[in-house]
Design a protein with these regions (language model features):
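Short acidic, glycine/serine/threonine-rich helix-capping segments at coil-helix boundaries
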Residues: 193-256, 262-265
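Acidic/histidine-rich, metal-coordinating catalytic segments
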Residues: 144-159
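Positively charged n-region of N-terminal signal peptides that target proteins for export
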Residues: 1-4
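Acidic, His- and aromatic-enriched active-site or binding-groove loops in soluble protein domains
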Residues: 64-65, 165-189
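Active-site-adjacent loop/helix surface patches within enzyme catalytic domains
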Residues: 20-145
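Extracytoplasmic/secreted proteins, especially bacterial periplasmic and envelope-associated proteins
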Residues: 58, 67, 126, 130-137, ...
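C-terminal motif of bacterial Sec signal peptides marking the signal peptidase cleavage site
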Residues: 12-15
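Second-shell loop/turn segments in exported
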Residues: 89-92, 115-126, 156-159, 190-197, ...
Length: 265
């Protein structure tokens, strides 16, 4: 019995000695966080349905903000990848699920009314206040640029319209949580375009690509290009989401492409 006990101890000791050992005394300089972007969404349905879809179906987000009190629910740990952005691209980087945090905001999106009119649904003040607090926390922890806080329609303009034209990007910019074009520069550039022929479609496509949008470079005003123009307008010109470039759209493209951003008053 004593010999069996000694043999057992020897086997146990040998197993411990042969276990994996990793030295963590050194750290490489060449590394960064998985999280490079935040992508904002609306759920296009009510809270209960949103919660079900984001927890029981093969779609998810890291956070869900409900619509009454602005309660923030964490559904996926930030170290894990959530399935929220889908087929996506920004500034040449694709499949942003792997490099982003997704935030879903409970909102019906839009309702199609008679004669083809679209009614967009507003966000509650409680939701926006909660979102601002959450974004400030995420931005600080991951040292994110305000340029990398995006809408789903920015990264997937051919498929998505969220968070929509009623989303308060300008207000987020006041909090340092989004970029906003220099309004004086936009006004000056608009005055120039008011007096001359507007740029052609190839120019528009080039500016959109410089900003970060995945857009065809065909010189043709095709359906994909119109959708990308609408995505840009929803973000920076929500009063004119038509897919048609007017003098203000052109001015905004110039100012945003050259990254002439300011904090709005």
């Amino acid at each position: 019995m004593k010999k069996l006990f000694l043999c057992f101890c020897l086997i146990l000791l040998t197993a411990c000695q042969s276990g994996l050992k990793i030295n963590k005394d050194y750290q490489a300089v060449g590394q960064d966080s998985r999280v490079q972007y935040v992508v904002l969404h609306y759920t296009a349905t009510d809270f209960n349905r949103s919660l079900y879809l984001l927890t029981k179906e093969p779609v998810s987000s890291h956070y869900l903000i409900e619509d009454q009190k602005g309660t923030i629910y964490q559904l996926v740990d930030e170290k894990n990848r959530a399935w929220h952005a889908g087929l996506s691209e920004w500034q040449g980087r694709t499949f942003l699920n792997s490099s982003s945090i997704g935030i879903e905001i409970v909102n019906e999106g839009f309702t199609e009314e008679a004669h083809g009119n679209i009614k967009w649904h507003p966000y509650s003040e409680a939701q926006i206040q909660s979102l601002i607090l959450l974004l400030k926390d995420i931005k600080a922890r991951y040292k994110l640029s305000a340029e990398n806080i995006l809408g789903h329609s920015d990264v997937a303009p051919l498929r998505k319209t969220d968070p929509g034209p009623l989303f308060p990007w300008r207000r987020l910019a006041k909090e340092g949580l989004a970029v906003w074009p220099n309004e004086q520069a936009v006004a000056a550039q608009k005055a120039v375009f008011d007096q001359q022929k507007l740029p052609d479609t190839g120019w528009v496509q080039e500016k959109l690509a410089i900003i970060g949008y995945a857009v065809p470079q065909t010189g043709l005003l095709d359906k994909p290009t119109v959708k990308v123009i609408k995505a840009f307008q929803m973000r920076y010109q929500p009063e004119n989401v038509t897919g048609v470039v007017d003098s203000k759209t052109a001015a905004l493209l110039v100012v945003v492409a050259r990254k002439d951003f300011t904090t709005p008053k």
